Amino acid sequence: MQLVQLMKLVYENNRVYNILVPYVRWTFRRMLQRVNYVGLENIPKDAAIIYSPNHVNTLLDALAILSSGKSPVVFAARADIFRKPTIARILNFLKILPIYRIRDGADSLVENDWTFRNAVLSLNAGLPFCIFPEGRHSQEPGLLPLRKGIARIAIKAAEDLDKPVVIVPVGLVYDDLKTFRTGLTIRFGQPIAVDDTEGLELADMAEESGKPAVTGQKRTRRLLLKLEEKMRPLQEWKQSHTRHPVILRSILIAPFALIAGLFLLPAFGLTTFFDKKISDKAFLNSIRYVACYLINPIIWLIISLLLLIIVAFGVFPLPLWASLLLIFAPVPMALLAPAIWYGVVR
């Protein structure tokens, strides 16, 4: 079965998604020591928005974009992670579209037409679209060469939509890529207007020169050069800030950190397991986020339900206040534990 047959239109409203997104935004901000948003005024209110961030911290980069506004965001990701039908459906539910590359096979590139149409429909419905134009993540300094996908989607959107289309370059700068509870600055640059009349001008020029076949290539190249010029200073930009007195703070909250550590034991087990399995350590902080804020609370919710059953059947008679504490405290503690623990252990 082809992948597109498994997928639905990602711009359609989904109640479960709408419930989960506020939770993800809250936990993402809790995970970080601080988040600074710079240049939000550069995001137009009445245009189709295509975000173009640098890619350094795997899943967390996407969460950074999702946490920047109130609207759902449609993302693009490499197609090879969609190979299993179950995973493909989950990613589709999360409003993530597959992008095929030449390494996926020349025949598979035609599937990008469906992705591009879906992206344009999402933009027309008012949802921002985000694609990492470097095509892969890298924690090395500097910007990788930009791929053509973002330019092609932007040009198609400008041709098909009756509203302005802009690419907003985004710089994601983490204080320390190896630290889980680090600081993050998200800087939005000046938008790049994608004018559909530019394509007509290039077509005229190409017709006069007798080379109409290069029109799309010229337009794509021109847009990528503009984007690279805008993105490079954003991802190299550093913010100076005053560090908190880490030693004093650590001493003050150390007793609470010990309790928090107990509630993080399931998460520690998961991260330790995957740390030994993965070769690309750039994924480690993303795994920590999933373990601490998605899987760990579910485990403690199950434990709370088991405790509720035990208390309800009177296996261990306890005062009412102790029973309520035993049942309702684990999940909130599991949610608060990462910020407390990683505030001491960095």
Q: What does each model-identified segment do?
A:
Residues 2-5:
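Low-complexity, intrinsically disordered or signal/transmembrane-proximal segments
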Residues 10:
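Conserved functional hotspots at enzyme active or ligand-binding sites that engage polyanionic ligands
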Residues 13-192, 198-199, 258, 269-346:
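Soluble catalytic domains of membrane acyltransferases
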Residues 201-245:
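Long, charge-rich alpha-helical interaction segments
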Residues 224, 228, 252, 267-271:
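A general structural signal for well-ordered alpha-helical packing
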Residues 244-248, 280:
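Short, membrane-interfacial amphipathic segments enriched in basic
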Residues 247-266:
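Transmembrane alpha-helical segments and their cytosolic interface motifs
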